[in-house]
Regions:
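Short intrinsically disordered, low-complexity coil segments enriched in acidic
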Residues: 1-4, 359
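Proteins enriched for Cys/Gly/acidic motifs involved in redox and nucleic-acid/cofactor modification
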Residues: 48-296, 335, 350
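Short, low-complexity intrinsically disordered segments enriched in A/P/G/S/L with frequent Arg
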Residues: 4, 18-20, 24, 32-35, ...
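Conserved SAM/AdoMet-binding glycine-rich loop
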Residues: 166-168, 175-177, 280-366
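Ser/Thr/Pro/Gly-rich low-complexity, intrinsically disordered segments
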Residues: 9-12, 17, 23-24, 50
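Short, positively charged and aromatic/hydrophobic N-terminal segments
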Residues: 2-3, 11, 41-45, 51
Length: 366
């Protein structure tokens, strides 16, 4: 079996559910939750005006618990240094293979940043890599099959180099049944962690090296925000900037809320500083990322929304263009359109992931 690296991003298709998930469904008021539910984090919140069920997060968001403390992030930089020192005589080589959406691409750039801080150089050949990271997608069945096929192919590289560390991360890794399948059937995989644990990748990798054991970090968490992670951006023209994580919509066909957690917005000052830095570095096209950017700021509790963020970013001096994705139509506003129309730097395009034009189908899709 040959390893086949992911050449192109997987495109998310409307209504495609991928494989069925395992686990107990949550019920309340005689209603059943949307398909794909395997977490106790959600609950039935009544009905819409058309009697379709409403679903929401069971526990209110606590911003204090979402933000990863600076001292915990500093510890991760210490683990990076420790790993670099452990391999000072022969620096590690790493390969990062990304499946899925632009958010996964942005996550992989942070993974590469952390690996670079550990002293790693990069290769596209898994046979030459000391650390192999597969950042996975749980949206499409085809992408999952590619991941499992590549995991199987990596048994040969592991036999040739028993010291090789194989890591599985991303949305697939957050699913409990996937983690268990890897634990039982892919015993050459050393580290499995979901998107919620991305920020502590250095610590998890250090545990693999020092404790000589397999490490799994797929806790059922609401999600977090970690600022200041290292990043390696590919190219010098386009940059991805995550402005929020997770999703509060429970579309019946979509797994994202269950693997990415609830919506949580980054502080606007952090985003503005990051974009200002990218413009100063010469980046010309900056894409703001979120599962639903139009709901940015709702969890901040300061009366600051996505239109306010775009208006603030537009004030940055320089030659650049701002794009954003994805946009949920129900959360768009005239204020947003007015800001876009008056902006010097926001692209005259609105990304709308249209799923159907039929009200009945849309209701069935929640």
């Amino acid at each position: 079996m040959q390893y086949t690296p992911q050449a192109n991003f997987c495109q998310i298709t409307a209504g495609h559910t991928g494989p069925a998930l395992q686990g107990a469904a949550v019920t309340r008021g005689g209603q059943s939750p949307p398909p794909l539910v395997f977490s106790r984090r959600i609950c039935y919140n009544g009905t819409n005006s058309d009697s379709t069920p409403l679903w929401g997060w069971e526990v209110p968001l606590d911003r204090a618990q979402v933000q990863i403390p600076a001292e915990q992030l500093a510890r991760q930089r210490d683990f990076e240094t420790k790993i670099r020192d452990m391999h000072a005589q022969r620096p590690l080589r790493a390969m990062v293979d990304t499946f899925g959406c632009q958010q996964n691409v942005a996550d992989s750039q942070h993974i590469m940043g952390m690996l670079e801080a550990m002293g790693c150089t990069f290769t596209d050949d898994p046979a030459q890599a000391d650390v192999v990271v597969l950042n996975t997608c749980a949206i499409r069945d085809h992408a999952e099959k590619r991941v499992y096929g590549n995991l199987g192919a990596l048994t040969h590289t592991k036999k040739a180099n028993p010291q090789q560390v194989i890591c599985l991360c991303g949305c697939m890794a957050q699913r409990p049944e996937v983690a268990e399948k890897v634990r039982q059937s892919y015993r050459h995989v050393d580290l499995v962690f979901g998107p919620q644990a991305l920020w502590k990748f250095p610590e998890l990798l250090y545990q693999v090296y020092t404790q000589r054991r397999r490490v799994f970090s797929v806790a059922d968490e609401h999600g977090s925000i970690a600022e200041g992670m290292p990043v390696v951006r590919e190219g010098r023209t386009r940059a991805w900037v995550s402005i929020m994580y997770g999703c509060n919509n429970f579309c019946s066909y979509c797994i994202v809320p269950y693997v990415r957690g609830r919506e949580r917005s980054r502080d606007p000052e952090r985003i503005i500083d990051e974009v200002r830095g990218l413009v100063a570095e010469g980046f010309k096209e900056i894409t703001l990322l979120g599962q639903n950017v139009n709901s940015y700021g709702k969890d901040l509790g300061i009366g600051y929304d996505f239109a306010d963020l775009l208006a603030a970013l537009d004030q940055i001096e320089g030659d650049y263009l701002i794009r954003f994705m994805s946009s949920q139509p129900k959360d768009a506003s005239h204020k947003l359109f007015d800001v876009m129309a008056a902006s010097r730097h926001v692209a005259r395009q609105l990304h709308l992931p249209v799923q159907s034009g039929c009200d009945r189908v849309l209701r069935a899709m929640n």
